[in-house]
């Protein structure tokens, strides 16, 4: 018998997987979303993003991770069920280079998803450029940003507020 907590956790995982499948299969023209995370709760981001990344891993295109200083471990990529042969990572990038690299990568159409870590808010022009690049390349872009204290009513443009840390 499962406890009520286990049943809720299973239901949440199943819903996340179904939603990820629908997003990955949808005929999208491109998507940019900001994901707010808190490193104290890594399971939440993994619960939401991993099923989507696993579905996107079935495409012939690459997954690009633009990380500031952290490196993805081979063991984590494999245990997360991501295709090791389709995951690329570039690290040690400054924020402006990261943004420009993300735009170029999204435009190419070679990547199903580009994930980048940024600490600062985007300007309207930067958001417009990212959205146009994602639409051109028919790709998804996730901007990972740590939770910052904010003003009441302040929120990301198109976002998932997830308290987590996928970075190792």
From Swiss-Prot:
Q: Which PANTHER family match?
A: BLR3025 PROTEIN-RELATED, CELL DIVISION INHIBITOR SULA
Q: How is it modified after translation?
A: Is rapidly cleaved and degraded by the Lon protease once DNA damage is repaired.
Annotated region described as Lon protease binding, given as residue ranges: 161-168
Purpose of the protein: Component of the SOS system and an inhibitor of cell division. Accumulation of SulA causes rapid cessation of cell division and the appearance of long, non-septate filaments. In the presence of GTP, binds a polymerization-competent form of FtsZ in a 1:1 ratio, thus inhibiting FtsZ polymerization and therefore preventing it from participating in the assembly of the Z ring. This mechanism prevents the premature segregation of damaged DNA to daughter cells during cell division.
One GO BP on record is: negative regulation of cell division
Q: What is this protein called?
A: Cell division inhibitor SulA
Quaternary form?
A: Interacts with FtsZ.
Annotated region FtsZ binding: where? 105-111
Disulfide bridge map: none
The answer to whether keyword Cell cycle applies is yes
Query: Which family is this protein grouped under?
Result: Belongs to the SulA family.
Q: Which organism is it from?
A: Cronobacter sakazakii (strain ATCC BAA-894)
**UniProt entry tagged with the keyword Cell cycle:** yes
The UniProt induction remark is: By DNA damage, as part of the SOS response.
Instruction: Write down the InterPro entries for this protein, in alphabetical order.
Output: Cell_div_suppressor_SulA (IPR004596), P-loop_NTPase (IPR027417), SulA_CellDiv_inhibitor (IPR050356), SulA_enterobact (IPR047696)
> Residues at site: Essential for degradation by Lon protease?
168
Taxonomic classification: Bacteria, Pseudomonadati, Pseudomonadota, Gammaproteobacteria, Enterobacterales
Residues in the signal sequence:
none
Supply the alphabetized keyword list. Answer: Cell cycle, Cell division, DNA damage, Septation, SOS response
């Amino acid at each position: 018998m499962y406890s009520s907590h286990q049943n809720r956790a299973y239901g949440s995982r199943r819903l996340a997987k179904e939603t990820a499948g629908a997003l990955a299969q949808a005929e999208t023209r491109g998507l940019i979303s900001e994901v707010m995370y808190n490193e104290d709760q890594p399971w939440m981001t993994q619960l939401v993003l991993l099923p989507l990344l696993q579905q996107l891993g079935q495409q012939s295109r690459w997954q690009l991770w633009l990380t500031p200083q952290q490196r993805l471990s081979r063991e984590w990529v494999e245990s997360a069920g991501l295709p090791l042969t389709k995951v690329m990572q570039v690290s040690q990038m400054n924020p402006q280079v990261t943004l420009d690299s993300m735009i170029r990568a999204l435009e190419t159409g070679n990547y199903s998803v580009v994930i980048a870590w940024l600490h600062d808010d985007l300007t309207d022009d930067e958001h417009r450029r990212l959205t146009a690049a994602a639409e051109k390349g028919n790709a998804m872009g996730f901007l990972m940003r740590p939770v910052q204290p904010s003003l009441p009513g302040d929120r990301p443009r198109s976002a998932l507020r997830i308290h987590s840390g996928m970075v190792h």
